[in-house]
Amino acid sequence: MDILLTKNGNEIAIYEGMKLNSVNTTYISTHIDKAIKNYNPLGTATYIIAYVDAINYNDFWERYFNYLSTYKYPLPIKTLITKKKTPNAAIKAAFMVVSRDEFDFPVYFMTFNIEK
């Protein structure tokens, strides 16, 4: 976990960041598992952020979303992953809900196009 946000001593969000220039499935799966299972015993809302330096950002996003859609998550899925609208072309997002010990919590996947 890169950042743990708290309010009044309570966990409110986990932030896991990574830099990608391709859909490196091994690297991505390691970050997903860390964020939603290994470092998240309470079922805290989770944000998995990818800073993307790819030649074709839209193509990257489609391959990344396809991977996320077929990934074998380490926790039960309550709501399948769906794409979300974003405020501009340099940001893409998706959302799902997983469950830990019968407690459901959201997982947000966001990518930011940082290509120069």
PLM regions: where:
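Conserved acidic residues
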Residues: 2, 12, 44-46
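Residue-level detector of beta-strand face positions
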Residues: 2-4, 97
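Active-site beta-strand-loop-beta-strand hairpin of nuclease catalytic cores
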Residues: 4-14, 103
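Short, flexible loop/turn elements at secondary-structure junctions
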Residues: 7, 18-21, 111-113
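Hydrophobic/aromatic beta-strand patches that form the interior of the parallel beta-sheet core
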Residues: 13-15, 47-49, 108-110
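Hydrophobic transmembrane alpha-helix bundles
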Residues: 15, 19-36, 79-95
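Catalytic cores of nucleic-acid endonucleases
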Residues: 19-75
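Domain-level recognition of nuclease-like catalytic cores that cleave nucleotide substrates
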Residues: 51-116
